């Protein structure tokens, strides 16, 4: 009996669809006008998407207006926001489990990276630290390294001081470096996470050579990557970002690894995508992506010239993109940690002249060569079109 009812309903639905199509044809509407590339159905879908985008834009503007009025720290869904920030409250961005997004009054966006404060994570530090002595901070660091060991892969890179005798703005000595690191670790332990820029550090005007870099980096979509800066320049620039009473900083190595753990544990992203081959989640040479974002731009000559907006790769190509060009490059609402440009961190690489560290992949290589967890080294004098950075707040 149930089978017959379902079958009858199915026939009725099919008959209704056929009837509508026949009536449209009788009214002079052809099948191609209905289903073609510029057909009624496709246009209706596009109109729906544009309406949704328009709705999101309005919510973003409202959040930015709210942020301008937030002169004190606020709490939202159990997370403390810096002064001058507000949650976007947009579907898909309004949950810690999805990657909670906040904005300042000018459209700079950050994502909350949750770091669980549990006995499983802090096996040696425990959950009762209040004084945060150097020894206790060392235990916190050791526990977080163990928690993220799958992304370290036995590396010798460490969040340790190494001198930079060439550039101005680096840490003066080991104590100054350790003080900054312990401040970060203390904040993560107390607040159960930290904020990270949703986008690679960006800049409004395209930068095509090394040298002085004074423009404050932004965290917005569809702007040029802030490249051609050295590691120490990136540190200085990150510290200039307005963050209220929070600290804005270039990321330490452990923070990068904690983001990957967050993506895996909350976003159910398979570690093979993060550690072995990130092709499908980043702008790599062998990712044959199709960009439909009309506000994005692309470059085929390492950022010397950009063109907009949409582009489809049919073959392996080296194409540099503006920030946040496509949602397929986003995990937990954090864009471009795999591919596009490499990103400087505060981590020490080697003891010799190649002491600086950058993470992730870039547009000139395949996804299995430089996956998201990748660590590489370079010199204190190095800067390039393919190296940028990202800001964190804690």
Tell me what each language-model feature is.
Residues 1-11:
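N-terminal leader/signal peptides at the extreme start of proteins
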Residues 10-32:
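N-terminal single-pass transmembrane signal-anchor helix
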Residues 33-58:
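Aliphatic-rich helix starts adjacent to a transmembrane/signal segment
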Residues 50, 57-75:
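Beta-strand/loop motifs with alternating small/hydrophobic and polar/acidic residues, enriched
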Residues 73-123, 248:
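GGW-centered surface loops in extracellular recognition modules
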Residues 106-107, 135-336:
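Short aromatic-cysteine micro-motif
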Residues 116-120, 199-203, 346-352, 363-365, ...:
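Acidic glycine-/aspartate-rich tracts in secreted/extracellular proteins
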Residues 229-232, 236, 242, 247, ...:
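Disulfide-stabilized, aromatic/cysteine-rich ligand-recognition loop
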């Amino acid at each position: 009996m149930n089978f017959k009812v379902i079958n009858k309903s199915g026939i009725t639905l099919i008959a209704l669809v056929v009837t509508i199509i026949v009536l449209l044809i009788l009214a002079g509407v052809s099948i191609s006008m209905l289903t073609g590339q510029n057909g009624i159905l496709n246009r209706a879908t596009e109109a729906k998407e544009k309406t949704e985008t328009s709705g999101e834009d309005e919510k973003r503007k409202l959040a930015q207006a709210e942020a301008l009025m937030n002169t004190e720290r606020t709490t939202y869904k159990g997370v403390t926001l810096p002064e001058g920030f507000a949650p976007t409250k947009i579907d898909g961005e309004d949950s810690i489990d999805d990657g909670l997004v906040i904005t300042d009054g000018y459209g700079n966006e950050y994502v909350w990276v949750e770091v669980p404060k549990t006995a499983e994570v802090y096996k040696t530090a425990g959950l009762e630290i209040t004084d945060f002595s150097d020894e206790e901070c060392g235990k916190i660091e050791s526990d977080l390294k163990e928690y993220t060991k799958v992304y370290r892969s036995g590396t010798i890179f460490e969040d340790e001081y190494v001198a930079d005798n060439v550039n101005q703005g680096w840490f003066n000595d080991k104590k100054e470096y350790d003080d900054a690191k312990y401040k970060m670790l203390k904040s993560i332990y107390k607040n159960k996470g930290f904020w990270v820029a949703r986008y690679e550090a960006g800049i409004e005007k395209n930068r095509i050579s090394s040298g002085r870099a004074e423009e404050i980096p932004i965290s917005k979509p569809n702007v040029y990557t802030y490249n051609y800066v050295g590691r120490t320049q990136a540190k200085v620039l990150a510290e200039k970002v307005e963050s209220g009473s929070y600290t804005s900083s270039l990321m330490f190595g452990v923070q990068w690894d904690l983001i990957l753990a967050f993506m895996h544990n909350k976003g159910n992203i398979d570690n093979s995508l993060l550690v072995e081959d990130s092709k499908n989640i980043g702008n790599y040479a062998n990712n044959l992506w199709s960009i439909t974002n009309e506000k994005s731009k692309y470059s085929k000559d390492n950022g010397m010239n950009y063109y907009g907006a949409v582009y489809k790769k049919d073959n392996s190509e080296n194409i540099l993109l503006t920030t946040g060009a496509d949602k397929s490059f986003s995990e937990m609402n954090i864009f471009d940690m795999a591919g596009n440009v490499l990103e400087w961190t505060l981590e020490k690489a080697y003891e010799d002249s190649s002491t600086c560290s950058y993470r992730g992949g870039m547009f000139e290589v395949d996804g299995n060569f430089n996956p998201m967890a990748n660590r590489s080294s370079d010199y204190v004098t190095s800067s390039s079109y393919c190296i940028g950075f990202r800001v964190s707040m804690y």
